[in-house]
Amino acid sequence: MSNGKLILLRHGQSQWNSTNQFTGWVDVDLTEKGEAEAKRGGELIKEKGLHPEVLYTSLLRRAIRTADIALNAADRLWIPVIRDWRLNERHYGALQGLNKADTKEKYGNEKFMAWRRSYDTRPPELEDGAEYSQSDDPRYANLDSVPKTECLKDVVARFVPYFKEEILPRAQKGQTVLIAAHGNSLRALVKHLDNISDDDIAGLNIPTGIPLVYEIAEDGSVVNPGGTYLDPEAAAAGAAAVANQGSK
């Protein structure tokens, strides 16, 4: 049996990516650039001869629309789709909606980077009923409680068990699975796949719209540690741009 494949695709540029705002669970849409990135991601998938058989994505439109655009470009729009909140972006708490550069200037680089990139430091909580709260959002009505803030450790705790139970078995059977998600939900997954330490994960940045492919053996092990970007040059530039967020 041939190896299975996981295609990790971070959503294309969102409206708040373009304005350098913390987004989290706020349901902003793609920009025109983001739509173009999603289309190019799908074209790369097709050009490399990859054939996704199922899609997993979040409940946020920037990931859902990225997946639709990419699958259309790859001629795979017909495949089954599973949407689950556990693939959502990290909840940024009271930082949601704030400009990153202004936040860094106000609180200092050390606190800014701890909130943004440390493994287990949560930003301040977002109060229920606040402007960017999801406490009354109908898509989360079945949750016992909606997060008020999260660190990356929290994202690992909600996403990785779901991945092991629902997604990994498909890859172990040789399937090709597309996972269209977010910077931090994908960082959580890559941390697990590559066994990255809690300290080192701070240095990992996922670029928008560029597919990252992992080959998975029948026993669930990763055949190509670190994964393979379908456009390495663009991925390096994109990751550097993500790392530089917070600058004016």
UniProtKB/Swiss-Prot annotation:
Keyword Secreted found: no
Reaction equations catalysed: (2R)-2-phosphoglycerate = (2R)-3-phosphoglycerate
GO molecular function: phosphoglycerate mutase activity
Record has Glycosyltransferase as a keyword: no
Annotated site residue numbers, Transition state stabilizer: 182
GO term, biological process aspect, one: gluconeogenesis
Pfam families in the record: His_Phos_1
Pathway connected to this protein: Carbohydrate degradation; glycolysis; pyruvate from D-glyceraldehyde 3-phosphate: step 3/5
EC number: 5.4.2.11
Residues in coiled coil: none
Catalytic residues (positions): 11 (tele-phosphohistidine intermediate), 89 (proton donor/acceptor)
Binding site for substrate: 10-17, 23-24, 62, 89-92, 100, 116-117, 183-184
UniProt keyword list: Gluconeogenesis, Glycolysis, Isomerase
Protein family membership: Belongs to the phosphoglycerate mutase family. BPG-dependent PGAM subfamily.
PANTHER family reported for this sequence: PHOSPHOGLYCERATE MUTASE (PTHR11931)
HAMAP family: PGAM_GpmA
Job description of the protein: Catalyzes the interconversion of 2-phosphoglycerate and 3-phosphoglycerate.
NCBIfam families (alphabetical): pgm_1 (TIGR01258), PRK14115.1 (NF010713), PRK14120.1 (NF010718)
Protein name per UniProt: 2,3-bisphosphoglycerate-dependent phosphoglycerate mutase
Lineage: Bacteria, Bacillati, Actinomycetota, Actinomycetes, Mycobacteriales
